[in-house]
A protein has these predicted regions:
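Contiguous, well-folded functional domains in the mature portion of proteins
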Residues: 1-212
């Protein structure tokens, strides 16, 4: 990982500290004008703190081949492609936790960044046209899968700390996307899904399904 093992052990993601300080500064200045404006500034601080929160998560122990949700949010795609591979997409609104997690035990085989647009991440075409970062993995059994961090209408920065050659456990935090986004999973043919369209999931806790 591009960061140390203690990087994500704080209740607030460290990437959010500069934003929290700026919001706190704005709130302080607003209090100089009026209490009402100052309270609005405190709401801004609360929003930023909430966005970058890092709540503790208990990663499920089984079953073998389980796929853990890589993000908090709502399932907007859960389907089998004509090729037989299975696609799951999770949309994160600005109130969800935005840290992204590794879905399976495996080794990172590739990381690729794609520049692009910033349309609403809930649209299907966002997966192909928006700024995104693809992480490819291979399990111990040789199954390949990819997860793609997709920037959204508000999101303007994708952070990914996973590196090729690393072996990571399911539930490991590997990055985040700032202020509204989406994560796409491309899973092997024969994957059994345990979630449905519209379902709300929690990163690192909800089991999306099992690998073949």
């Amino acid at each position: 990982m591009k960061v140390g093992p203690d990087h994500f052990r704080t209740p607030i993601a460290r990437e959010g500290i500069p934003f929290i300080l700026v919001a706190g500064g704005i709130a302080s200045v607003l209090f100089l004008f009026s209490k009402v404006l100052g309270l609005l500034g405190l709401l801004l601080v609360a929003f930023v703190v909430n966005f970058f929160r890092n709540p503790p998560r208990q990663v499920p122990a089984g079953p073998p081949g389980r796929i853990v949700s890589p993000a908090d949010g709502k399932i907007v795609v859960a389907e089998t492609a004509p090729t037989g591979r299975v696609k799951v997409s999770i949309f994160m609104n600005v109130f969800n936790v935005h840290l992204n997690r590794i879905p399976v035990d495996g080794t990172v085989t590739g990381v690729t960044y794609f520049p692009g647009a910033f349309m609403n991440a809930s649209f299907d075409k966002a997966s192909e046209q928006n700024e995104r970062n693809r992480v490819e993995m291979r399990t111990e059994k040789g199954e390949s899968l990819t997860m793609v961090q997709v920037a959204g209408l508000v999101a303007r920065r994708i952070l990914c700390y996973a590196e090729p050659g690393e072996t990571l456990s399911a539930g490991t935090i590997y990055g985040l996307i700032r202020f509204g986004s989406r994560v796409d999973l491309d899973l092997p043919a024969g994957t059994t899904l345990a979630v449905r369209l519209g379902e709300t999931v929690k990163g690192g806790e909800t089991i999306l399904g099992t690998l073949p």
